[in-house]
Design a protein with these regions (language model features):
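Short, surface-exposed "cap/lid" segments of acyl-processing enzymes
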Residues: 1-18
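Serine-dependent carboxylesterase/thioesterase catalytic core
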Residues: 2, 21, 26, 33-118
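Hydrophobic transmembrane signal anchors and adjacent membrane-proximal interface regions, especially
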Residues: 5-9, 76, 137-139, 156
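Short, glycine/acidic-enriched capping/hinge loops at junctions between secondary-structure elements
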Residues: 6-8, 34, 121-122
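Charged/polar, solvent-exposed surface patches and flexible loops
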Residues: 9-13, 41, 157-162
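Short, acidic/turn-prone active-site loops that include or flank metal/cofactor-
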Residues: 26-27, 136
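C-terminal catalytic-base region of ester-bond hydrolases, centering on the histidine
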Residues: 96-166
Length: 166
């Protein structure tokens, strides 16, 4: 358990003078659907925001994907990184099914690791990142990042270095 340390470099990278950056920590021992009202309350409280960009990693990507039909009034980009969107366990224990549509104001990006290099997923007999959702842009991450294996935790740093936050 990295206890969130994998977010330090990415947050330092994307936080700048023109970007207001927030970190939302939630109870990952609970099903993600239970957290949506709390997160929507936080998003709704933001004033004078023209656009929001949400990055969710791993299980946080599941939480982020549940916002596809929730956010209506603000231009939104949702980026899910190394997220087990097709997890049979989440379906079994939480009743989670990935959304089948999204609001028109929402752009959706999936950043997928290479399963055999991702130690969170390489023991699965399927790739839990794979879903059939035509309204998303899918980016397959490379094998290496800064000369090292690009696995589950490094994926956030790679995205922070390569995402366009305009």
């Amino acid at each position: 358990d990295s206890r969130g340390f994998e977010w330090i470099y990415p947050l330092q990278t994307i936080d700048n003078e023109v970007t207001k950056t927030y970190f939302f920590r939630w109870d990952t021992t609970k099903c993600p659907q239970k957290t949506i009202p709390i997160l929507m309350k936080e998003i709704s409280a933001m004033k004078d925001i023209k656009k929001i960009t949400i990055l969710g990693h791993s299980y946080g990507g599941i939480l982020s994907s549940l916002l596809l039909n929730e956010i209506e009034a603000i231009e939104t980009e949702i980026h899910v990184i190394a997220a087990p969107l097709g997890s049979s366990d989440l379906k079994k224990y939480c009743g989670y099914d990935h959304q089948t549509s999204k609001n028109n104001n929402v752009s959706y990006y999936q950043w997928r690791t290479i399963k055999k290099l991702d130690y969170a997923f390489n023991s699965f007999d399927y790739d839990p990142q794979l879903i059939d959702f035509k309204e998303s842009i899918v980016v397959r991450l490379p094998r290496e990042y800064r000369g090292k294996r690009l696995g589950h935790l490094w994926s956030i740093s790679w995205v922070a270095d390569n995402i366009n936050l305009d």
